[in-house]
C-alpha cells in the first residue's frame, strides 16, 4: 500500500506573505507623518529616509518628458550613511540629481533606457567606478523586467492631480506611470506619487487610489521637457534631399500607411515635406495615415492638410495640449479633452501594429549595425530597438509588409520596414559609417557582456544617406548587403570598399538607388520645399493652438 503523505513540520512551513508584512512595517514607520495617504510637502525627505532600506530597488519616474523631480531632489538629499547602495530603475536619466545619487553613494546600480542629457556624465561615473550598469534596455524591455526579475521595492512617480483618496489624474503626460505603479503595487511595494495639486474632483481617474500608498504636493510643478520639438529653421537642404528620396523610394514604393518616426531633424523634414512634395506626387490618402508617435509639432501641417487619420502617443509634448484637445478625431483623448498617452502600449503598437520604423543614428558599421553610444557618451536607445526590428510574432498582413517577401516558398512571411537615416559624415568631418562601432569599445571598457548596439544590422531593411538608398533586404548574402551599404556610404572608409562598376551592377539590380534613379532633383531639394520653415509657421498652421515653449520663441 502507498504510504500516507507526511505533512511537513510546522517549523519548515514557508511563509507566503513576507513582502506584505515588510511593507506594513515600513508604512507603520511613517504613519505619524501622513494624514491618510497625504504626506505634507515638508515631510517628504523624512518619510523617504524612514521608508527606504539600503539596497532597495527603486523605480524613479524619469520619463522621456515628465520628471518626478521633487521626489528625485528629495532623494538626493538623504543621508548616505542611512540610505545607500540603491538599485535605480529609470527609463530616462534626464536630471543632474539622478546622477548626484551615485556621486553621493545613495545609489550604486542602474538599469535604464536613455540618458541623452546626462550621457557624458554617465560615462564618467562608470569610468570612476561610482556607477554600475546592469543593462541598457529598450523601454518595454525595462518595464517587462519590472514584472520579472527587477521588481521594484519602491516606486517614485508623478501625476498632475490627486484627490484625498489617492486617485491620480496624470493628464496628457501619462507616459509610463501606470506600468511602474502596477509593477510595484501588486508586488507589495510602496508607491509614492508627487502631484501638482490635491483637489476635490478629478477630471478623470487614470490610476486608482488603491494602487497608491502616499501622495505629496510638490514644491513646484513637475519638470517636463519638450523633447520632440524640432525648430524647422535648423533643417538643412541635405536633410530635405534625404527626405525626398525616402518619400519617393520607400514611402511611395511600398505604400507605407502605418509608421513610427524616430526623433530628429531627418524625420522632421519628412513630416514637413508631406503637404508639399508628397502632395505633388499625389500620395495623400495612400501613405502616412496611422501613426505611433509623440505629438510632434512638425506634424501639424500634415494633420491640417488632411494626411493623418490617427496618432497614438507615447507621451505628450509641451505646448501641444490645446491643439490636441481641438483635434479629438486624430488623437486619443479622454472625456476631459486631454490626451491619454501610454508609452508601453504605444511601444507595443510601434512594434506590432505599424509597417515601418524610420529613424536616425549616430554611427553605423559595414554590416548596418547602428548605435547612439559613442566614445565618452553613453546615451542609450529609448524605444528604437523595440520598434526598429522585425517582430517575428506578427501574423497580420498589409501590402507594405508583403512587399518585402523575397523567398519563393509555400510558407513565407512578410517583413517590417526598418529604415536608418544618416549623413555619411557628422559635424567636424567625422565619418558616420565606420569599420567598428564605438559601442564595441565602450561595452568592453564598461564590462558589459555584449556591445550596446541600438539596431542590429540584420533587422535593417533600408539605409538612406545623402548619396542614395540601399535596399538591404534584397541582398543575396552578407557580402552583397555590405556592398549595397558601401554604395551609399560616400567617401567614408566603408564607401571605399566598392568600385564604380560594382555600384552600377547593384543599381541595375535594384539594390541601390540614387536621387536620379528615383526622379528626385537635388536642385529642387531645398528648404523652400518645407511646409513650415520656422516655429512661427507651425503656430500659424495650428491656428494659434500650438503654444511653443519660450526657448523656441523668437518673437
Where would I find each of the regions flagged by the language model?
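Conserved alpha/beta enzyme-core scaffold
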Residues: 2-555
